[in-house]
A protein has these predicted regions:
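Exposed, interaction-prone regions of secreted/extracellular proteins
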Residues: 1-250
């Protein structure tokens, strides 16, 4: 499908999506698309479209998932094919100061021993990003371990990244790593990991409409929780998206 913003969305059979390229997932069934909801959370409500590709009214049929097609020029912007769609190894990111001249940020966080999920609502803006070396985002971030080699991170939110997507549109994204961004993990569905179950939401696709100063406001609410079956499950706007099977090393 051709999206009004220029993206091409492919409807891929659920069992043929990139996650099942992983040796430990080959031949397995996709995650349950109606997982048990945590106490205190509402079940699925009437879904309000929030992505540009859905404004035409088209969607993918049942049994398939919508995957944004990667363009050749997007891969060429990466430092290497291996690094495409991945963050580079980093030191400590989780800082509460804003003294850097290059990285302006604000962080709210809680520490504890046993968290089985989190929920965040984020206002969606479309700030101008000048070049491929800049980005803007709002995300929730669930981590364990230290910022050494044992960091595990699960992330989701919206981001504007000309380096990754080639434009200045805010896009719904996910990310994961199990070794502090060294060799594992990626954005969205650009490697084996995230198993998508929803046929109406495309991870990596543009969000529309967005908030305006003094005008109407738009947000996205994301819920991530761990099931008793050891799956990490994602919901956005009260609709299940998919998740990760932690038994497979994610």
């Amino acid at each position: 499908m051709q999206s009004p913003d220029g993206d091409i969305i492919d409807c891929v059979l659920t069992h043929k999506q990139p996650a099942f390229d992983h040796p430990l997932l080959r031949g397995q069934k996709p995650l349950d698309d109606h997982p048990e909801i945590p106490k205190g959370q509402n079940g699925e409500e009437e879904f309000e479209e929030f992505q540009a590709w859905r404004t035409t009214g088209e969607t993918c049929p049942e049994g398939t998932v919508p995957i944004r097609r990667t363009r050749e020029e997007e891969m060429l912007r990466a430092s290497s094919v291996r690094r495409f769609g991945r963050k580079g190894p980093i030191g400590s990111i989780l800082r509460t100061d804003t003294t850097s001249n290059f990285h302006e940020h604000a962080v709210g966080y809680v520490n504890g021993d046993r968290y089985y999920g989190a929920k965040a609502s984020m206002n969606v803006w479309a700030p101008h990003v000048a070049n491929t070396q800049e980005f803007s985002l709002s995300q929730m971030w669930i981590i364990s371990g230290s910022f050494g080699g044992d960091l595990n991170s699960i992330e989701a939110g919206w981001q504007i990244s000309p380096e990754i997507y080639g434009d200045n549109r805010p896009r719904f994204f996910t990310y994961w790593t199990s070794d502090a961004y060294r060799t594992t993990g990626c954005y969205n569905l650009l490697c084996s990991g995230f198993v998508q179950t929803n046929n109406r939401i495309s991870i990596g696709a543009a969000i529309s409409p967005t908030s305006s100063y003094g005008g109407r406001q738009y947000d996205i609410s994301i819920l991530i929780w761990k099931e008793v079956s050891n799956n990490l499950v994602y919901r956005i706007r009260s609709v299940g998206i998919g998740g990760y099977n932690l038994d497979q090393g994610y």
